């Protein structure tokens, strides 16, 4: 394996970093259960990756649907609490410091089995996941009911394939 092509062509570095301060308000709330911080979006990283802090603040509510992505990997790093991680074969309790990498096509899901929990979620390459998260938030907030076909269309539009 070799290094990828150069992305910066200047002879000297530049001041271009972006700092996210802990304690910042979430960028999005999905119902009473999830708060999402957009740390680095696919757009802000030039499509290299998307990184989000996902805080599950509400009580657990059922088992989430397992799914996979065709265009990107997804990784989870547990920050606090217990995150239930499904690796396509079994559920495991992820504790702070635990990490799960899921390549494209890998079946996965997550939940908070025992109360509040936080994790970092990384998509690579970066994709416009914010649009998907925001549509989910709108559906939850409005109480809008989707047909099975509408759910399928939403999922497929955002590279999410339920199993």
In which residue ranges do the predicted regions lie?
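A short glycine-rich, His/Asp/Glu-containing loop-to-beta-strand
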Residues: 24-66, 72-73
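Ligand-binding loop in jelly-roll beta-barrel domains
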Residues: 84, 93, 104-130
């Amino acid at each position: 394996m070799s290094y990828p092509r150069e992305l910066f062509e200047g002879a000297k570095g530049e001041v271009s970093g972006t700092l996210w301060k802990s304690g910042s308000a979430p960028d999005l709330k999905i119902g009473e259960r999830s708060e999402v911080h957009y740390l680095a979006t696919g757009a802000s990283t030039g499509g290299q990756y998307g990184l989000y802090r996902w805080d599950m603040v509400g009580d657990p509510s059922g088992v989430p649907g397992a799914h996979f992505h065709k265009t990107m990997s997804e990784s989870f790093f547990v920050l606090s609490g217990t995150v239930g991680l499904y690796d396509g074969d079994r559920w495991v309790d992820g504790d702070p410091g635990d990490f799960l990498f899921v390549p494209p096509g890998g079946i996965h899901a997550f939940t908070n089995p025992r109360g509040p929990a936080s994790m970092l979620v990384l998509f690579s390459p970066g994709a416009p996941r914010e649009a998907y998260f925001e549509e989910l938030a709108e559906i939850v907030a409005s109480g809008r009911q989707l047909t099975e076909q509408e759910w399928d269309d939403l999922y497929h539009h955002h590279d999410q394939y339920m199993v």
